[in-house]
């Protein structure tokens, strides 16, 4: 069997378990000696990580449009310096990508969806995700998980209604689209790990 080099995205609101799953898949790839790169957004290289610190710093209070532009700046650096070099050459695991911008900045904050899509299209050009996991969590578990987080950033401080709007946005993006897989983070973690791993195996071995 030959190995495909897909771009795989893990999406979801804070506390939904996406980072736990991406770390699990990373460890699996390391054990199997499968070449991959793991990137987070905002982040992925020195320039994008610098912008990330600005966005998430609790001391900052940017308006929603400034936030949007900072996310795009970080993504531009990430694509130019990291993703382009690895696209189709290595499996790419992304902790957040373009759907996060639409879910948070459009569905959550009310910014223009057409503008967001236009800039994303300009940045991505021919880069396309092959598989997108969207982790969903109910309000009760969300509140519980956020309370347990040791390192809180500015986006951990929004109210539950905001996160519910964002999550509904994610589900709208995923509706009737084959690249998307909804992961119910209210289920046992071991079940979700198995589901994610099985889906990934199906696309990396063709």
For the regions a language model picked out, list residue spans one by one.
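Walker A (P-loop) ATP-phosphate-binding motif of ABC ATPase nucleotide-binding domains
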Residues: 7
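Hydrophobic positions on the alpha1 helix immediately C-terminal to the Walker A/P-loop
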Residues: 21
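Hydrophobic anchor at the beta1->P-loop junction of P-loop NTPases
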Residues: 10
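A glycine- and Lys/Arg-enriched "phosphate-lid" helix/loop adjacent to the NTP-binding pocket
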Residues: 101-168
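ATP-dependent small-molecule kinase phosphotransfer cores
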Residues: 34-124
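NTP-dependent small-molecule kinase module
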Residues: 2-3, 26, 140-206
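Walker A (P-loop) phosphate-binding loop of P-loop NTPases
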Residues: 15
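Conserved lysine of the Walker
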Residues: 18
């Amino acid at each position: 069997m030959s190995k495909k080099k897909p771009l795989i995205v893990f999406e979801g609101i804070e506390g939904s378990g996406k980072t736990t799953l991406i770390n699990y898949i990373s460890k699996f790839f390391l054990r199997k000696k499968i070449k991959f790169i793991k990137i987070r957004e905002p982040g992925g290289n020195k320039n994008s990580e610098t912008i990330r610190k600005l966005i998430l710093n609790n001391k900052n209070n940017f308006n929603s449009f400034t936030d949007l532009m900072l996310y795009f700046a970080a993504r531009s650096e990430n694509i130019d310096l990291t993703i382009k070099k690895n696209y189709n050459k290595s499996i790419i695991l992304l902790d957040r990508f373009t759907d996060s911008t639409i879910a948070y900045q459009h569905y959550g904050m009310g910014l223009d969806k057409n503008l967001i899509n236009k800039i994303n299209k300009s940045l991505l050009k021919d880069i396309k995700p092959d598989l997108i996991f969207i982790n969903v969590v109910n309000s009760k578990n969300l509140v519980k998980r956020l309370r347990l987080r040791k390192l809180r950033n500015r986006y951990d401080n929004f109210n539950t209604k905001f996160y519910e709007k964002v999550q509904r946005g994610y589900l709208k993006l995923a509706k009737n689209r084959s690249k998307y897989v909804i992961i119910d983070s209210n289920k046992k973690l071991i079940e979700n790990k198995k589901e994610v791993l099985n889906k990934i195996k199906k696309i990396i071995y063709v």
